[in-house]
Amino acid sequence: MSDLPISTELFNRAMAGNRDAQFELAEIYMQSENDEHVALAEEWALKAAQLGHVEAMYWLGEGYAFYAKDMLEEDPEEAKTYFEHAYRWLEQAAKHKHPAALLELSNFYRRGDVVEKDVTKSVELVKQAAELGEVQAMRDLACIYEHGLGVDVDDEKADYWHDKAQSAEE
Protein backbone atom coordinates (compact mmCIF):
# COMPACT_ATOMS: atom_id res chain seq x y z
CA MET A 1 0.00 0.00 0.00
CA SER A 2 2.49 2.64 1.16
CA ASP A 3 4.70 3.75 4.00
CA LEU A 4 1.72 5.50 5.60
CA PRO A 5 -0.07 4.08 8.67
CA ILE A 6 -2.80 2.26 6.75
CA SER A 7 -3.99 -1.03 8.19
CA THR A 8 -5.11 -3.84 5.94
CA GLU A 9 -8.43 -3.80 7.80
CA LEU A 10 -8.98 -0.10 7.04
CA PHE A 11 -8.01 -0.54 3.40
CA ASN A 12 -10.34 -3.54 3.03
CA ARG A 13 -13.27 -1.65 4.57
CA ALA A 14 -12.63 1.25 2.20
CA MET A 15 -12.46 -1.09 -0.78
CA ALA A 16 -15.74 -2.67 0.34
CA GLY A 17 -17.45 0.73 0.09
CA ASN A 18 -17.41 1.91 3.70
CA ARG A 19 -17.54 5.69 3.35
CA ASP A 20 -16.08 6.35 6.81
CA ALA A 21 -13.08 4.16 6.01
CA GLN A 22 -12.73 5.84 2.62
CA PHE A 23 -12.62 9.27 4.21
CA GLU A 24 -10.18 8.07 6.87
CA LEU A 25 -7.91 6.83 4.09
CA ALA A 26 -8.21 10.21 2.34
CA GLU A 27 -7.12 11.98 5.52
CA ILE A 28 -4.13 9.66 5.95
CA TYR A 29 -3.02 10.10 2.34
CA MET A 30 -3.38 13.88 2.62
CA GLN A 31 -0.79 13.94 5.43
CA SER A 32 1.86 12.98 2.87
CA GLU A 33 3.86 15.44 0.77
CA ASN A 34 3.93 12.89 -2.04
CA ASP A 35 1.88 14.04 -5.07
CA GLU A 36 0.70 10.49 -5.71
CA HIS A 37 -0.64 10.28 -2.15
CA VAL A 38 -2.40 13.64 -2.53
CA ALA A 39 -4.10 12.31 -5.67
CA LEU A 40 -5.13 9.19 -3.74
CA ALA A 41 -6.49 11.40 -0.95
CA GLU A 42 -8.71 13.18 -3.47
CA GLU A 43 -9.78 9.87 -5.02
CA TRP A 44 -10.83 8.36 -1.67
CA ALA A 45 -12.52 11.58 -0.53
CA LEU A 46 -14.52 11.65 -3.78
CA LYS A 47 -15.63 8.05 -3.21
CA ALA A 48 -16.71 8.86 0.35
CA ALA A 49 -18.49 12.06 -0.70
CA GLN A 50 -20.32 10.28 -3.50
CA LEU A 51 -21.59 7.83 -0.88
CA GLY A 52 -22.92 10.71 1.22
CA HIS A 53 -20.05 11.38 3.65
CA VAL A 54 -20.76 15.01 4.57
CA GLU A 55 -17.33 15.83 6.01
CA ALA A 56 -15.74 14.50 2.80
CA MET A 57 -18.00 16.82 0.80
CA TYR A 58 -16.86 19.79 2.88
CA TRP A 59 -13.23 18.66 2.77
CA LEU A 60 -13.29 18.47 -1.03
CA GLY A 61 -15.01 21.84 -1.31
CA GLU A 62 -12.44 23.49 0.94
CA GLY A 63 -9.56 21.79 -0.86
CA TYR A 64 -10.79 22.78 -4.31
CA ALA A 65 -11.42 26.37 -3.16
CA PHE A 66 -7.91 26.58 -1.68
CA TYR A 67 -6.37 25.24 -4.89
CA ALA A 68 -8.49 27.60 -7.02
CA LYS A 69 -7.33 30.63 -5.02
CA ASP A 70 -3.71 29.51 -5.53
CA MET A 71 -4.27 29.16 -9.29
CA LEU A 72 -6.15 32.44 -9.78
CA GLU A 73 -3.27 34.54 -11.11
CA GLU A 74 -1.42 31.76 -12.89
CA ASP A 75 -4.37 30.16 -14.71
CA PRO A 76 -7.76 31.88 -14.25
CA GLU A 77 -9.61 29.28 -16.36
CA GLU A 78 -8.31 26.36 -14.30
CA ALA A 79 -9.08 28.33 -11.14
CA LYS A 80 -12.66 28.81 -12.33
CA THR A 81 -13.02 25.06 -12.89
CA TYR A 82 -11.82 24.36 -9.35
CA PHE A 83 -14.08 27.08 -7.92
CA GLU A 84 -16.98 25.29 -9.65
CA HIS A 85 -15.93 21.96 -8.10
CA ALA A 86 -15.59 23.67 -4.71
CA TYR A 87 -19.01 25.27 -5.00
CA ARG A 88 -20.66 21.97 -5.96
CA TRP A 89 -19.22 20.07 -2.99
CA LEU A 90 -19.79 22.88 -0.50
CA GLU A 91 -23.38 23.15 -1.67
CA GLN A 92 -23.83 19.41 -1.10
CA ALA A 93 -22.38 19.63 2.41
CA ALA A 94 -24.51 22.72 3.12
CA LYS A 95 -27.65 20.78 2.18
CA HIS A 96 -26.73 18.52 5.10
CA LYS A 97 -26.40 21.57 7.38
CA HIS A 98 -22.61 21.41 7.68
CA PRO A 99 -21.87 24.71 9.49
CA ALA A 100 -18.42 25.39 8.02
CA ALA A 101 -19.67 24.55 4.52
CA LEU A 102 -22.52 27.04 4.93
CA LEU A 103 -20.04 29.71 5.98
CA GLU A 104 -17.67 29.01 3.08
CA LEU A 105 -20.58 28.91 0.64
CA SER A 106 -21.63 32.34 1.90
CA ASN A 107 -18.31 33.68 0.63
CA PHE A 108 -19.10 32.45 -2.88
CA TYR A 109 -22.29 34.53 -2.85
CA ARG A 110 -20.63 37.52 -1.19
CA ARG A 111 -17.87 37.66 -3.81
CA GLY A 112 -19.83 36.32 -6.77
CA ASP A 113 -17.46 33.38 -7.33
CA VAL A 114 -19.02 31.13 -10.04
CA VAL A 115 -22.48 32.22 -8.86
CA GLU A 116 -24.24 35.53 -9.21
CA LYS A 117 -23.32 37.87 -6.38
CA ASP A 118 -26.14 37.80 -3.82
CA VAL A 119 -25.40 39.55 -0.53
CA THR A 120 -28.81 38.65 0.91
CA LYS A 121 -28.19 34.94 0.30
CA SER A 122 -24.66 35.30 1.69
CA VAL A 123 -25.97 36.81 4.93
CA GLU A 124 -28.64 34.10 5.21
CA LEU A 125 -25.99 31.37 4.88
CA VAL A 126 -23.80 33.05 7.53
CA LYS A 127 -26.84 33.19 9.81
CA GLN A 128 -27.58 29.48 9.27
CA ALA A 129 -23.96 28.60 10.06
CA ALA A 130 -24.03 30.76 13.21
CA GLU A 131 -27.27 29.18 14.37
CA LEU A 132 -25.63 25.77 13.95
CA GLY A 133 -22.77 26.79 16.23
CA GLU A 134 -20.05 27.93 13.80
CA VAL A 135 -18.13 30.46 15.91
CA GLN A 136 -16.54 32.28 12.97
CA ALA A 137 -20.02 32.73 11.49
CA MET A 138 -21.18 34.23 14.80
CA ARG A 139 -18.29 36.72 14.65
CA ASP A 140 -19.04 37.49 11.01
CA LEU A 141 -22.72 38.01 11.76
CA ALA A 142 -21.90 40.41 14.60
CA CYS A 143 -19.78 42.42 12.15
CA ILE A 144 -22.49 42.27 9.47
CA TYR A 145 -25.08 43.73 11.84
CA GLU A 146 -22.66 46.21 13.41
CA HIS A 147 -21.67 47.71 10.06
CA GLY A 148 -24.85 47.10 8.06
CA LEU A 149 -23.21 44.85 5.48
CA GLY A 150 -26.17 43.77 3.36
CA VAL A 151 -28.59 44.38 6.25
CA ASP A 152 -29.72 47.35 8.28
CA VAL A 153 -27.40 48.27 11.15
CA ASP A 154 -28.73 46.51 14.24
CA ASP A 155 -26.65 47.00 17.38
CA GLU A 156 -28.84 44.63 19.39
CA LYS A 157 -28.26 41.75 16.95
CA ALA A 158 -24.57 42.66 16.67
CA ASP A 159 -24.20 42.47 20.46
CA TYR A 160 -26.19 39.22 20.60
CA TRP A 161 -23.91 37.47 18.07
CA HIS A 162 -20.75 38.95 19.57
CA ASP A 163 -21.74 37.64 23.02
CA LYS A 164 -22.76 34.27 21.59
CA ALA A 165 -19.37 33.92 19.87
CA GLN A 166 -17.54 34.79 23.08
CA SER A 167 -19.60 32.27 25.07
CA ALA A 168 -18.97 29.56 22.49
CA GLU A 169 -15.21 30.10 22.72
CA GLU A 170 -15.13 29.64 26.52
Regions found by a protein language model. Give the residues of each.
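Alpha-helical tetratricopeptide repeat
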Residues: 7, 11, 19-23, 58, ...
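Canonical positions in the second alpha-helix
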Residues: 11-13, 47-48, 91-93, 128-129, ...
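Hydrophobic face of amphipathic alpha-helices that form TPR/SEL1-like repeat modules
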Residues: 24-31, 59-73, 102-111, 143-147
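Residue-level detection of beta-strand scaffold positions
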Residues: 26, 30, 43, 57-58, ...
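Short helix-capping/linker turns of helical repeat alpha-solenoids
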Residues: 16-18, 31-32, 51-54, 67, ...
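Eukaryotic tandem repeat interaction scaffolds
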Residues: 83-110, 119, 126
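Structural signature of tandem alpha-helical TPR/SEL1-like repeats
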Residues: 2-8, 35-44, 70-89, 116-125, ...
